[in-house]
Amino acid sequence: VKHVIIGTAGHVDHGKTLLIKALTGIDTDRLAEEKKRGITIELGFAHLDWPDGTQAGIVDVPGHERFIKNMLAGAGGVDLAMLIVAADEGFMPQTVEHLNILTLLGIRDGLIVITKKDMVDAEWLEMVQEEVRERAKGSFLEGKPILAVSAYTGDGIAELKQALYTLVHAAAEKSVRVPFRLPVDRVFSVDGFGTVVTGTLIEGCINEGDAAELVPSGSETRIRNLQVHGSTVHTAYAGQRVAVNLAGLKKTDVQRGDAVARPGSVRISRMLDVKLTNLRDSGRVITNDMQVHLYHGAAVMLAKVVLLDRDALEPGESAYAQLRMAEPIAAKNGDRFVIRFYSPLETIGGGVILDDAPVRHKRNVPAVIEALRIKEGGSAGDRVEQTLVELKTALPVAAQLAAKLGMEAEQLAAELGGLLGAGRIVEPLPGRYIASSALDEVAASCKTLLAGYHAKNPLHAGMKAAELRQKLFRAMEQTIADALLSELCREGVIRRAGERYALAEFEVRYTKRQNAIRDKLLKYYRGAGIEPITVEEVVASFPQNERADFKQVMDSVLSAGELVMLSPEICYHKEAYARACGAAKAHFAENETITLAQMRDSLGTSRKYALAILEYFDKTGITKKEGDFRRLNRGFPPAQA
C-alpha cells in the first residue's frame, strides 16, 4: 500500500479548509479562534479515501503570513502539493511565498486548484486560469493540471478527486527499510494515556512497543500506542500521518520541532553543510555571516550563514554554505530547509542538507567545495568514498556509514563491493572500511616516521610497535591501529620484525668490525644457554676500543629479537628464551600456577635465572604475580607458543 501526504498551500481565505471538507467531509479547523476568524492558524489534518481502498493524508496549512512557521511545520512531510488560488482574487503575496516554500522543500509534483468558481463569470475564470498558468512557469507546477471548483456547489470536486487519485498512484514509494523518523508538529495530553505527538512519518516504519529516542534532547521513550487517521494500528509506515502515545515523557518534555526516531539513528549537531538557494524574487542579497531564521521540519531556530566560496549570494543564485546554530538540531543528509530574513520575517531562500554533522570549515578552501560537490551530485559510490575520506582512520562499520549517508543497507553493500573491487577503498578488518586515499596518508606519515627512526638508529631492526602506534595514531583503539599497520605490511609499505616495524626496503648494515662483534656476541650467548654470565662481564670481555661499537651492536641484536634482555644483568639468546617459555608453558598445561621453585626445577637452573625469567614474564604481561606464585595473564605470544 502506498502512503502519500497531500499538502494545501495558498493565500489566506482562498478556501483551502472548505475545499478539504468538500473532498473529505472533514473540517480541519480545530481551534475556536479559527472558527471565529474563518482562517486556519494551526495545522489541520484529514484523509481522502477512494472506493478501491486508496487513501491519502491531507495537511491543511495556514495561509496568513503571520502563520508561515505553522505552514512550514506541516509542509515538511508533503509529497504532493495542492496550490489553492481563489477565482475572485488570483495570485496573492502568500500564494507566491507558499509556492516558493514548496519548491525549496523539494516537492516536485502536484496541481493547482482555482476555488470559488461560482463567484465569477466564465470570462473572468478564464483570465484567472491564464494568470495562474503564467505564474506557475519556472516552478514544479509548470504544466501541471489546473482545475476550477466550487466547494459550495460541489462543481469540479469529483474531477479534482480523480486527478488527485492519479497523482497519488504516480507518487514515488517512500523507504520503509531505514530507521524511522517522525518530526513532531503537535504535542498534547490525553487523559488516561499521557503525552501524544503527531507528525508525518517521513521515513521507516514504526511499531507499537518500539524503543524510541526524542531528538535533539536524547530522552528515551517507548511507543505505547499508534493511530493513523483516527484508527489504532500496530505499525505505521513512511508517508502516513501518525499520532504516537509516548511512554515515560511529560507534555513539557516534548516541543514542536523535536523528532521521534530510532535510538542512535539521528546525529545531533550545531552546524550543517548545505546547498543554499536565494529565491529569484527574494529582493535580498544573502551576505556572509548573515543571521537568519532556519526552518527544518517543524523546528525553528536562529542560524548564521557562512558562505564557503563567496561573500554574497544574489537573488536567483545558489552556493555552498555552512549554517551555524546556537542550539542543537536533529537533521539528516538530504533533508530540505527554508530560511527567512531575520527582520522583517520573509522567506528568502532554502535548500538541501549535504552534511548533517560537519566539522567547522574555513572559507574558500577548494577541497571543501569539491567534497560538497560530490555530496550534492556525485554517484552513490562517490558519496560513500567521500564519506570514508572524511572519516579518515575511524574504520566505520556498514551500519554507521548507512546512517551517515541515509542509504539503505542493500544499496550500501553493493556500493562497498564495487569500491573494494575498484581499489578505491580497503577493508583492514572484516566489515570495517577506509578510503584508499586515507590509507595512503597513513602510509606517508608512517614512512616519514620510520625513515627518521632508521636515520637515528641505523642498527635497530625497527621501531617498537607500541611506539609507532602512539606516534602515528595517538589514542586510537589498538585493534584498529594494528589492522592499519597490517594493511601497510600487506601493501609492501612496511614490514614487521618481531615486535618492531621497519620500512620494507630497510636493512641493517654493519661495518666489518660491528659484524665481527655481532658474530662473537651471538656465538657466546647461544653457547651459554640458560646460565650466561652477567651483561657487565660480557661487556668487559671486549677490548676498550670496541666498546662504543659493542653498545650499538647490542642494541641492534636486541631490537631484532636475536637476544632478549631479561634484566639489566641477564640476557638470553632467543633460543634459550624459547626453551624457558616452553618449560613454563608445559607446566601451565597441567597447573594453574607456578612458583619460583617450580620454574627453577623445570629448567634445571639456579634460583637467580628462574627469578629473572619469571619477572620478565610479569613485565611483559605473560604472567601475573599473586603472593608467592604466578598465574597466566595474557599468555605466551605465538612466537613462544
Task: List each model region and its residues.
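Residue-level signature of catalytic and energy-coupling elements of molecular machines
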Residues: 13, 19, 38, 60, ...
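Conserved nucleotide-binding/hydrolysis micro-motifs of P-loop NTPases
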Residues: 64-65, 88-92, 107, 116-121, ...
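Conserved G1/Walker A P-loop phosphate-binding module
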Residues: 1-61, 65
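C-terminal effector modules of nucleic-acid-centric enzymes and ribosome-associated factors
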Residues: 120-124, 134, 249-565, 573-622, ...
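Small-residue-enriched segments and motifs
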Residues: 6, 43, 56, 144, ...
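Conserved Switch II/interswitch segment of TRAFAC-class P-loop GTPases
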Residues: 54-55, 61-66, 76-127
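Conserved catalytic-core segments of large NTP-driven translation/proteostasis enzymes
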Residues: 117, 123, 134-282
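Residue-level recognition of beta-strand microenvironments
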Residues: 11, 187, 204, 226, ...
